[in-house]
Design a protein with these regions (language model features):
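Hydrophobic packing positions in regular secondary-structure scaffolds
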Residues: 1-364
Length: 364
């Protein structure tokens, strides 16, 4: 089961009040299909009894905020309050929220659909967001936290990141609702914090979660994180290689190696853990399936001769269509030297195919 599939099952189980194991049969369903079901269930839950909820929301307008907070906590409870929140004017909701204790607001956050209350969330003071986040971390409510990331302004997001430790941040990032927001999250962290997170990924066995983040940030951030990882000791990088191999995450790792500085890329290529035949086979397979030939060609000249021969041995079985993709990648990215090095290690029949393709693009 993919990481995304596991995350979607966790989220659906949470919404239904079930154990993830009870939904194990969904491991064979596409993650997006599980997400679609979850969104339909969410809509059904939050749209049920809408008229009654609107009457509750209207009632809060005619009583003082202090009394509304007391009613919310003592009579309505977190679940009902979560469903009413999106029906309140943001300023009114924030005024009530500032009178509620942090533990109750954390209860409410767990039940809330942030997409329906985005305007309210955006206006809650950053200090209060930090307090709620700390409470959610204490409860290990990573799924709830992940849902809020795309709805927090920068000051609030910064307060939230300061309230969590590295392990909690990685676990939250892996279940974030909108992965496109990961770049903004990473952008708030200085190099010291990023280095600490990389070490934590190794020490806490959270490389799969960390590599998932790398697949959703900008090219510049990918290179920065790759360079920071390459500066760590071999044990840290070997842990990343093992995770990429066991979880089949080379499609996430290869773009990182291309975005690295030349020195960092060379350091990665010199790792003995990268040079084994099973790992090289997985790298070549990822390049083939995800059209990552430029990433592989950039890495290839940096591998020791024995490792390059292993890659060439794997390439001997390629059909003409694969060789066409490789030559096209070399042509588009000016990686001819790397391709020629690769071709020099191939058996004569494959070399002949490469030579014919050279002529087709005017390189003869």
């Amino acid at each position: 089961m993919s990481l995304d599939g596991g995350v979607e099952i966790l989220k659906l189980a949470r919404l239904l009040g079930a154990e993830p194991e009870d939904l194990g049969y969904l491991q064979y369903v596409a993650p997006q299909d599980i997400r679609d079901v979850r969104e339909q269930v969410t809509a059904a839950i939050f749209d049920a009894d809408r008229q009654m909820l609107q009457r509750v929301a209207a009632a809060t307008k005619v009583i003082p905020s202090k009394l509304a907070a007391a009613v919310a906590q003592q009579a309505l409870g977190a679940l009902l309050c979560a469903r009413v929140t999106s029906l309140l004017e943001p300023a009114r909701a924030v005024d009530i929220a500032r009178r509620l204790p942090t533990d109750f607001l954390a209860d409410l956050a767990v039940e809330l659909d942030p997409r329906r209350a985005s305007r309210v969330i955006a206006e809650i003071p950053a200090r209060q967001i930090g307090q709620i986040t700390a409470e959610l971390v204490e409860r290990e409510e990573y799924i709830a936290m992940g849902g809020f990331v795309g709805h927090l302004p920068e000051a609030s997001l910064r307060a939230a990141t300061e309230a969590v430790d590295d392990e909690a941040l990685l676990l939250t990032a892996s279940v974030i609702e909108a992965k496109g927001n990961l770049g903004a999250l990473v952008g708030l962290l200085d190099e010291e914090r990023l280095e600490s997170i990389i070490r934590t990924a190794h020490e806490a066995d959270l490389w799969p979660e960390a590599l998932d983040v790398l697949g959703h940030v900008s090219e510049r951030q990918r290179g920065q994180l790759g360079d920071l990882a390459a500066a760590q000791e071999d044990a840290v990088l070997d842990g990343m290689v093992r995770a990429a191999q066991s979880e089949r995450l080379w499609a996430d790792v290869l773009p990182v190696t291309r975005a690295m500085s030349p020195d960092s890329r060379a350091r990665f290529a010199k790792l003995k853990s990268v040079q084994t035949r099973p790992v090289l086979a997985s790298i070549v397979d990822a390049a083939s399936q995800q059209h990552l030939w430029p990433e592989l060609l950039v890495l290839l000249p940096l591998l020791p001769a024995a490792a390059r021969r292993r890659v060439a041995a794997l390439g001997t079985g390629f059909g003409r269509s694969i060789f066409e993709q490789i030559v096209r990648a070399a042509d588009e990215h000016d990686l001819w030297d790397a391709l020629e090095l690769f071709a020099s290690e191939l058996e004569p029949g494959s070399q002949q195919q490469i030579e014919e393709l050279y002529k087709a693009v005017g390189r003869a």
